Amino acid sequence: MNYYGAAALALPWIALPIATLVRARRSRSLDEYSEDAPVNAPLVSIVIPARNEARNIERCVRSVLASGYARLQVIAVNDHSTDGTGTILSRIAAEDSRLVVVVPEALPAGWFGKQWACTAGFAACHGEVVGFFDADTWQTPDLVPRAVNAMRNREADLLTVAGRQELGSFWERLVQPQMFGIMLARYGGTELVNESPRVSDKIANGQCIFVRRAAYEELGGHGVVRDKVAEDLAMAQVYFVRGKRTVVILGLNQLSTRMYTSLRELIEGWGKNVYVGGADSMPGWHRLRFLYPFALVMPALSGLVPPVLVG
């Protein structure tokens, strides 16, 4: 095969990453905002829903308590865990009075557990700004003050932070970059999302969402997305439709998470987010669900095709 033939075969594998990188450049970061609390800093309440998160919860909670933001309230919701999560939270609460531990009432019909836990946590909040964090996240001390400053600067009713993904196992390193690459190719950089006039382009990262209390209450809190699998995406779209300002921002130096640790967790987790959650957000997705298992590994394996064809 001559040079031109090889180049033609390789072009699709070169063009897509380049196009994705160009689109991703239109992004803004928390690094642009001050790590010092603003003048007249609002009280910020952080809600951490946790169900059977003994592996992660202590690191998450302690990272929040170590925040450089002074006016902070932390509420951890022990969602009827059976793995020791409650014991860990009780121990931390005994050491630090800023931590309030809440146990929600029984899950009512028509609700998903995370949304109900967030609702129970919000009931204990006093903050003008409320942050919802997944229990498998951890943050640096400057995340909250930078997020508050970004919310003020961008006049955001909802601000969601996209952090760094920690990858441990072989399957994580194979699958996670491909899945996030697909999402990046679809949505582009943060400013493409923020400036888009289309509701279908509005997204949020449920691992870290800040809301203005007034807007959250006005729209009905998590109750408005109580039956949605991809509740974060649905919330961003509800906010947009109702005339509220949503902002996606990078926090690669402030927020990190390890979503899954095994192939089984990857399949189950992305199954919720893509296979099921897609039905909530993309019309006609049910016709494409059969492609989901291939989507997990084919992007990575496709990288082998050009070398094989070229020889």
Q: Which residues are covered by each model-predicted region?
A:
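N-terminal membrane-anchoring/stem segments of glycan-assembly enzymes
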Residues: 1-38, 176-177, 187-189
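Alpha-helical bilayer-embedded segments of polytopic membrane proteins, i.e.
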Residues: 1-20, 280-311
